[in-house]
Design a protein with these regions (language model features):
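Short glycine-rich substrate-engagement loop in P-loop NTPases that contacts/grips substrate
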Residues: 11-41
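Conserved AAA+ ATPase small/helical "lid" subdomain
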Residues: 108, 112-127, 134-185
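Signal for well-folded cores of large energy- and translation-related assemblies
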Residues: 2, 24, 28, 38, ...
Length: 187
């Protein structure tokens, strides 16, 4: 699984009538979920923010979760050897069952609860992202950016950081501020 490409669909983007056509198959020339599945490059499928899709659409996934087959009015996609991951923002198993409903809930093989990242994990993430972003800088930019100062600033505020996206955005912003500040001071 690790190192493989990921087929990802952001279900929060599909909350209207157009999603029905996309999910159940519209005209043959229209974009649809089944065709996207056929063209995927990975057997790891991420249905991100599964909880955001309207409950009326859950039935489209019953056969996929039960038998590994996704079928719309135009295509039949065999996915038996795939790993399907659905994410949501629910806080408990009871909340998942209540909001999604039992028919879809009991089709999930396993539920993994997300816990806040430990301080050690956050520091490892900080270091990985800082090193990656620093290596992307040009030699002249590296002379301007005090990367160790940024690293120390983040270490001191590590418990205020929430997730990888948050850390990445802050690091990019801090590097950007240093570059802009230096450019303005040179003028």
């Amino acid at each position: 699984v690790l190192g493989q490409k990921l087929f990802r669909k952001q279900l929060s983007m599909y909350q209207n009538a157009e999603f029905s056509s996309y999910l159940f198959g519209g005209k043959h020339f229209q974009s649809c979920f089944a065709r996207d599945l056929l063209e995927r490059e990975s057997n790891v499928i991420l249905l991100d923010e599964f909880d955001k899709a309207a409950p009326i659409f859950h039935s489209a996934f019953y056969q996929l979760f039960d038998e590994g087959i996704f079928e719309d009015k135009n295509y039949n996609v065999q996915l038996q050897s795939s790993i399907i991951i659905c994410t949501s923002n629910y806080k408990s198993i009871e909340e998942i069952r209540s909001y999604l409903g039992e028919p879809i809930f009991y089709r999930f093989d396993n539920i993994i609860k997300f816990d806040k990242l430990s301080t050690d994990s956050l520091i490892k993430i900080i270091n990985l992202i800082i090193d990656k972003k620093y290596n992307e800088l040009t030699p002249s930019e590296k002379k301007i950016v005090d990367i160790e100062n940024i690293r120390l600033m983040l270490y001191k505020n590590v418990r205020k950081l929430n997730n990888v996206r948050n850390i990445k955005n802050i690091i990019e912003e801090l590097i950007g501020i240093e570059l802009v500040k230096n450019t303005l001071e040179d003028k």
